[in-house]
Amino acid sequence: MAFELVDLDRQGTRMKIIFVRHGEPDYSMLDKLENPQLYSGFGRDLAPLTGKGSSLAKEVAKTACFGKAEIIISSSVTRALETAHYIAVETGLDLFVEPFFHEWRPDLDGTNSDLTSVLVAHEYYLKHQGGLSEDSPYRYETDLEMRHRFLRALEKYKNYKTIIIVTHGMLMRQFVPDEKIDFCQVIECEIEI
């Protein structure tokens, strides 16, 4: 596991964030349904961790730097919440659920609910470096919108100096330089809000 310290130039209250990407999700139970399309989009967020994902989350819960944290805040998505639960059990820290710490939204209009459409939206997102081009067939969440959503939600926790946030890779990449973030990877950074 890689641990990095990232200093971002933001004004205001300084906060140390210990980001944790969620464990490996298990979509198989949703994919095996008679009508798996009923669980497309946010429906896929109901999937729990795989056995491997649970084991890795239990292992990462023992990470030494967690001892410096005051609270744990988790995305409300099942895979993040299950990961955060293991950390809370191990550390004894209070766990808060933050619905606005969710993953990147590939569909802001409710028009691209199938996997192919999501992949096309992601392709445009990457091609335009997190921006939204006029020729995009879908309106997805941009990097700027993701950062704004996260920072606005983070405001209510500004009285804490060190927090653990269990969330998703694309959201974490808005604040850390890592291009690839593994399941249960821990990355420390400082943010001013």
Feature names for model-found ranges:
Residues 2-17, 35, 60-63, 96-118, ...:
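Acidic, low-complexity terminal tails and accessory targeting/binding regions
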Residues 3, 8-97:
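Active-site-proximal alpha-helix that buttresses catalytic centers in soluble enzyme cores
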Residues 17, 70, 159-169:
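Generic beta-sheet signal
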Residues 26, 80-81, 104, 171-173:
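Short, active-site-adjacent cap segments at secondary-structure transitions
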Residues 77, 81, 151, 169:
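Conserved glycosyltransferase catalytic-site signature
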Residues 146-158:
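A short, acidic, amphipathic alpha-helical segment used as a generic capping/interface helix at domain edges
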